[in-house]
Amino acid sequence: MEVLMMEERIYTIPLRDVINKSVRTKRAPRAIKKIKQFLKRHMKAEIVKIDNELNEKIWERGIQKPPARVRVKAVKEGNVVIATLAE
């Protein structure tokens, strides 16, 4: 029987470069991709799932104005990372 280790970390992910380098109408989707890419690199996982709360926070002000940075709590179980909004 395998025992799965749960690893939990809190990150502040900067999204300003996505905002500055993207066309206005693609900022929020690119912010989501940036979060997934960041967590894949830092948590060394293949699959990253984003919680509904975090998704709503990114899309809160629409497609053109995602937040400049976001605090994320990442929980890794096996090869899957689940990202939620940190309090």
From Swiss-Prot:
One of its GO terms (cellular component) is cytosolic large ribosomal subunit. Pfam families: Ribosomal_L31e. The keyword Ribosomal protein applies. InterPro entries: Ribosomal_eL31 (IPR000054), Ribosomal_eL31_CS (IPR020052), Ribosomal_eL31_dom_sf (IPR023621). GO terms for biological process: cytoplasmic translation. PROSITE patterns: RIBOSOMAL_L31E (PS01144). The keyword Cell cycle does not apply. Keywords: Ribonucleoprotein, Ribosomal protein. GO terms for molecular function: structural constituent of ribosome. Belongs to the eukaryotic ribosomal protein eL31 family. This is Large ribosomal subunit protein eL31. It comes from Methanocaldococcus jannaschii (strain ATCC 43067 / DSM 2661 / JAL-1 / JCM 10045 / NBRC 100440). The gene is rpl31e.
